[in-house]
Each structure stands twice: as C-alpha cells, then as structure tokens.
Regions:
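N-terminal Rossmann-like NAD(P)+-binding domain of SDR-like oxidoreductases, especially those catalyzing
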Residues: 1-187
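Short, flexible, glycine-rich and Lys/Arg-enriched loop motifs at helix boundaries
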Residues: 42-44, 183-203, 214-235
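Residue-level signature of the cytosolic catalytic core of signaling kinases
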Residues: 61, 65, 197-201, 271
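Glycosyltransferase donor-binding loop in the core domain
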Residues: 64, 89, 101, 200, ...
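Short capping/connector residues at structural and topological boundaries
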Residues: 96, 137-138, 144-146, 159, ...
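Short-chain dehydrogenase/reductase
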Residues: 102, 151-159, 194-202, 206, ...
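A structural signal for well-ordered alpha-helical segments within the folded catalytic domains
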Residues: 107-110, 159, 163, 202, ...
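C-terminal substrate-binding subdomain of Rossmann-fold SDR/epimerase-dehydratase oxidoreductases
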Residues: 207-301
C-alpha cells in the first residue's frame, strides 16, 4: 500500500474545503489546513472535530506571505500533496476589484508552487471552475471544449492558474489534477458543516434558505427572459459531498496512476436546473418564499 503522507488543504474551513477534509479523513488520509478565515469561520473547524473525532491542525496565515508559508512546510516535512481551494471567489466583486483578485489568487498559487519545488512535493490538486469555459458556443462542455474569453477577473484567475500549472509540470517533477467543477450545492448530512460565507451570500442556495428563515425579506430572481423552460437562468448543480469525494479520488489518481503533467476533470451532474425549479425543489415552495423577477443585473453562482 502506498504511503500517502500528509495532505495540506488550503481553505480548509471553507465550504468545499471542510467537506473535503471529512472525506479525506474517512479515507485514511492525514491532513493539515491553512485558512485565515477571510470568508469562513473557526467554528467550521470545531464542527469538523465533532464530526470526525479528530482535531484539525490549522495555520491562520495569508498564503501570499511566502516566508510564513514556508514555516508550515519546514514544520511538516512529510507533506506529500496539496489541495488548493483558498481563493477570492465572488464574480461581481472581482469585476469591481480586479487587482485584488489577481494579486491574491495568483500570488498564493505562485507561493505554493515555490514550496512544491523547494520541498519536493509532487502531488497537487487545483480547485478550478467551469467558469474557465466562458460563454461556450456548444453545450454540454467537456474537458476538450476550447476556453472562451473569461466573463470576469475571477474566472480569468482560474484560466491563468491552469496555464501556470501546465507550464510548471513541464519542467518539474509534479503531477496535477485540475478539477473544473460546476455549482456546488447542499451540505453534509450531519448539518454540522455547510455553506456559511461572511457577508451577503452570492450563491443561490444560501440566499433561498436565508429567505425561508427570514434573514432576507425577499429572494430576487435576476433575469426572466433566458432561453430556458421558464425564462430563468439554468445551472448544473452538484452536491458538495460529491465534489469533496472527487478530490479524494483525484488524490488517489495522482498517487497511484498519474504520470507527471496535468489531468483535467470536469465535475458536474450533467443536468441543468433553473432558478425557479430550485425554489420549488424539495422543502422549498413558491408559497413560502417571496420572490421577485428582475433584470439580469446580477448572477447567482
């Protein structure tokens, strides 16, 4: 059996990161986390301990600070793989503050790759996004679909990161999985962890549930003239626990099968769901949610 060493998770207290930690621990991986809680809460790590029975070692630091980052690798020289989630991710904010997004998302990646080279880490899973496909001319997309012009600086940071990783693998002994996933949804069945961003949520499900719980007065549906069955925007949603398990599978692929270089994997359900269908789904109903149709001035993730 391959000794898989220790896995570093960046953004371990975040939505997808926390669910991935659960899945990795269930599959006998040892993990440590880096998260400065810029868009998450320490309580997520406390709940992970309740859920798994294991205390999560976390380092509260900024990944753009290379000297502080290197201290983690010096202390944990048995790190054998990295899953990189940590990034600024709000599309609309990235349009308003592009330099903030380019500086943070790219410099954090550069520093991690510097550490990969210095500390001989050869397995890297990157949290990419279906946003790299832009406004694709042909649907559904697959891993060979050409990348179109990015629709936001956030999406462009994902495109740039993929290119950097592809170039990096050409001259270094490293294996990379690029996971392009669609829209994560849901929460762990325990209810202890889920999507809990700071500030006003920009993903559709927290806005819907927040409206149901009375945290928001109304749920605004942006756009009602799309070429869809009910005129509202359609997205491919995938349960966050499935995405989390995909990262475990990607790591196993790197350790056991993959050769040096990049492998690209899309992660989605393959089925589109409109905003109105999502409102009507399961416990939600149009009778219990006050919603308003509006213009396409904003898009939920």
């Amino acid at each position: 059996m391959i000794n898989k060493g220790k896995i570093l998770i960046t953004g371990g207290a975040g939505y997808i990161g926390s669910h991935t930690i659960v899945d990795l621990l269930e599959n006998d991986f040892e993990i440590i986390s880096i998260d400065n809680f810029s868009n998450s809460y320490p309580s997520a790590l406390e709940n992970l301990k309740k859920l798994t029975g294991k205390k999560i070692i976390n380092y509260n630091l900024d990944l753009t600070n290379l000297s502080e980052l290197k201290k983690v690798f010096e202390k944990h020289q048995d790190i054998s793989g990295i899953i990189h989630f940590a990034a600024f991710k709000y599309i609309n904010e990235s349009v308003e503050e592009p330099i903030k997004y380019y500086r943070n998302n790219m410099n954090s990646l550069y520093n991690l790759l510097d550490c990969c080279k210095e500390y001989n880490i050869s397995n890297f899973v990157f949290s990419s996004s279906c946003s790299v496909y832009g406004n694709a001319e042909k649907l559904p997309v697959d891993e060979n679909t050409p990348l179109c012009i990015s629709e936001s600086p956030y999406a462009e940071t994902k495109v740039m990161a993929e290119r950097v990783l592809e170039d990096f693998t050409k001259v270094n002994q490293i294996k990379v999985s690029l996971l392009r996933y669609f829209n994560p949804i849901g929460a762990h069945k325990s209810g202890l962890i889920g999507e809990n961003p700071k500030g006003m949520p920009q993903n559709v499900v927290p806005r819907i549930t927040g409206t149901v719980l009375g945290e928001f007065e109304e749920f605004k549906v942006f756009g009602n003239d799309y070429n869809t069955k009910d005129g509202t925007c359609v997205r491919d949603y995938i349960h966050v626990s499935d995405i989390a398990h995909g990262h475990t599978l990607a790591l196993n692929w790197l350790f056991e099968k993959a050769k040096n270089g990049c492998e690209i994997f899309n992660m989605g359900s393959g089925t589109g769901v409109t905003v109105l269908e999502l409102i009507n789904d399961r416990e939600y109903s149009l009778d219990s949610i006050y919603y308003e149709l509006g213009t396409e001035e904003f898009k939920y993730l």
